[in-house]
């Protein structure tokens, strides 16, 4: 079976790169083919990378607190560009620190994300979920 291909990157004006590189390395070590678009990436860069590489999933990372704004409409754009079945994950500091996590998670589910990870979630948890979702 061919390796599953995953686009990763840091959305919006967020420039954290260390965590992005760790995610990249851990995914590769786990047998995934990783397309890393890096930091400071708009939604369309994730979508174009997924289209150009025939990717199976997109993992969006955001630490700077504006992930919700940056991700508005991303599922609709994926659908519009023919990526209706692509897995869409997000993790990092994506909500208000004063808000209950369940509320943040609910909003991102409503935005069309398949999996949502709170700050500090080990990448190994994401890898387990990817394998479940890919049935591998």
Curated annotation (Swiss-Prot):
It comes from the Bacteria. It catalyses: (2S,3S)-3-methyl-L-aspartate = L-glutamate. Its cofactor is adenosylcob(III)alamin. This is Glutamate mutase sigma subunit. Belongs to the methylaspartate mutase GlmS subunit family. Residues 3-136 form the B12-binding domain. CDD domains: Glm_B12_BD. Adenosylcob(III)alamin binds at residues 13-17, 61-63. Keywords: Cobalamin, Cobalt, Isomerase, Metal-binding. One of its GO terms (molecular function) is metal ion binding. The gene is glmS. Pathway: Amino-acid degradation; L-glutamate degradation via mesaconate pathway; acetate and pyruvate from L-glutamate: step 1/4. Its EC number is 5.4.99.1. One of its GO terms (biological process) is glutamate catabolic process via L-citramalate. Heterotetramer composed of 2 epsilon subunits (GlmE) and 2 sigma subunits (GlmS). GlmE exists as a homodimer and GlmS as a monomer. The keyword Endoplasmic reticulum does not apply. It is an enzyme of class 5 (isomerase). Catalyzes the carbon skeleton rearrangement of L-glutamate to L-threo-3-methylaspartate ((2S,3S)-3-methylaspartate). Disulfide bonds: none annotated.
């Amino acid at each position: 079976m061919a390796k599953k291909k995953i686009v990763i990157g840091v959305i919006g004006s967020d420039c954290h790169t260390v965590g992005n590189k760790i995610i990249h390395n851990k995914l590769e070590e786990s047998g995934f083919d990783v397309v890393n678009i890096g930091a400071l990436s708009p939604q369309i860069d994730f979508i174009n990378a997924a289209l150009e590489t025939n990717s199976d999933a997109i993992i969006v990372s955001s630490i700077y607190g504006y992930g919700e704004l940056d991700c508005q409409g991303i599922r609709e754009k994926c659908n519009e560009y023919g990526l209706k079945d692509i897995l869409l994950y997000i993790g990092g500091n994506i909500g208000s620190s004063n808000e209950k996590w369940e509320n943040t998670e609910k909003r991102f589910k409503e935005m069309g994300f398949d999996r949502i990870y709170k700050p500090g979630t080990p990448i190994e948890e994401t890898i387990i979920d990817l394998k479940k979702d890919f049935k591998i």
